[in-house]
Amino acid sequence: MAGLPRRIIKETQRLLAEPVPGIKAEPDESNARYFHVVIAGPQDSPFEGGTFKLELFLPEEYPMAAPKVRFMTKIYHPNVDKSGRICLDILKDKWSPALQIRTVLLSIQALLSAPNPDDPLANDVAEQWKTNEAQAIETARAWTRLYAMNNI
């Protein structure tokens, strides 16, 4: 981890020593600014039982700029688009240098428990969530079975 800012080293050490329950985040062997992340679908959510792969990258400006995060596993969620980009305020205008990688991962995990169709990135999914939530939840469960189980 030579050449990395001390803050990134400290955050990485803490993530490895004290993992967030339901989340695994490991730095890439060749680039310590790039993390391989796996988030377990939260209990009592349509994503329960799934394991979702994400990539997290710390830009050169971190912590003055937010990490770049995206889902690698397909997910049916109003706040995640087909490319895996995530609509989450702390990844955009609400980012603060006081926040950490850990905070970002916890916020993404919370977004899985509480999709927000009123601030969508995937408009079609959000529309389905608003007009027929039961059907949207069933589709999310089906996608979880299809794409997020036995995928690790």
Swiss-Prot record:
One BP annotation, GO: protein K63-linked ubiquitination
One short Pfam name that applies is UQ_con
Domain annotation UBC core: ranges = 3-149
Write out the PTM section of this UniProt entry.
Conjugation to ISG15 impairs formation of the thioester bond with ubiquitin but not interaction with UBE2V2.
Under the heading InterPro entries, the entry gives: UBQ-conjugat_E2_core, UBQ-conjugating_AS, UBQ-conjugating_enzyme/RWD
Can you name a GO cellular component term? UBC13-MMS2 complex
What is the location of the Glycyl lysine isopeptide (Lys-Gly) (interchain with G-Cter in ISG15) cross-link?
92
Indicate what this protein is called per its UniProt record. Ubiquitin-conjugating enzyme E2 N
Q: Origin organism of this chain? A: Macaca fascicularis (Crab-eating macaque)
